[in-house]
Amino acid sequence: MKPSVVRRSDARPRPDLHAVSDAIVLRDVRRAYDGRDVVCGVSLEIRAGEIFGLLGPNAAGKTTLLSIISTRIRPTEGDAWVHGKHVVHDVNAARRLLNVAPQEEALYPTLTAEENLAFFAELYGVRRSERARRVQEALDTVGLASRKGDRVATYSGGMRRRLNLGCALVSAPRVVLLDEPTVAVDPQSRAHIFDAVRKLRAGGTTIVYTTHYLEEAEDLCDRIAIMDEGRVVACGTLAELLPLARATEVIRLRLLHPPDTLAPLEAAEGVEKVEAVGNEIRLFTTRAQLALPRVYRTIAQLGQTVLQTRVTPVTLDDVFLELTGKELRD
């Protein structure tokens, strides 16, 4: 891979030949604001027709990366292509291939859902003869067909988020970028959004889905890139990422008092790693059944009392902790 350089505006770099069939290709993408990098040399290949998750805490660089892919901002360095179209040098061609459902809603509350969708269909250049069909398809996809004649001012927050997604669909994009689509929505609307995303994937649409909810990434995404401080620290399927935690199970203990030392627990047979926050202890292991009796004996020798014990499979939060030294939920 060649290092990224700042190119002249008339240069037209191309992705590697093997990557042209991918929906999105990023090569050494960097974005800086006021001399500070918020996206730091990201390289990714996102396959056509997959749900690709960008998982990370707030300020990880997810939204900025999405803005580069969508052509809303230019990278400081590096290159990005959407189905072979460069997001800087072929910007209009790239824009025709994708659409974005941003966190910020751009809806007209005095119009009905149907009228909002029709407006965006016209804005995106959908032929008049196709608009009614596109509007109805979007309503069906996001589960709002029965409320299409109601003014948006009467919608709940979750329904508005679903309509916001629908507005991105009327142009029939090959790539849809979803930026934290379920933040502060009700469970019913979240389920509708999940259904819509799965329908789009079934129809061959590529989805890039940013979230800081690890459960969403685990349940919904085909592959996941974990981001922290502008960098991709790991990328793969859930099955590929979970082993990075160096364990298969986590013993979660709540003690009566915070421990004075973790060294005896770290030395217990079967324990790979120990993390503590206050009186909450997490012990990473591949053999919880073997490790637990030894852990209990060690805790008793320390004069501690166990108030609660849970054994759970490792999660992406545990992977994030292993890779970055902090919790995704922090």
Predicted regions and their residues:
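Catalytic Walker B motif of ABC-type/P-loop ATPase nucleotide-binding domains
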Residues: 176-179
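Conserved ABC transporter NBD signature motif
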Residues: 78-89, 93-94
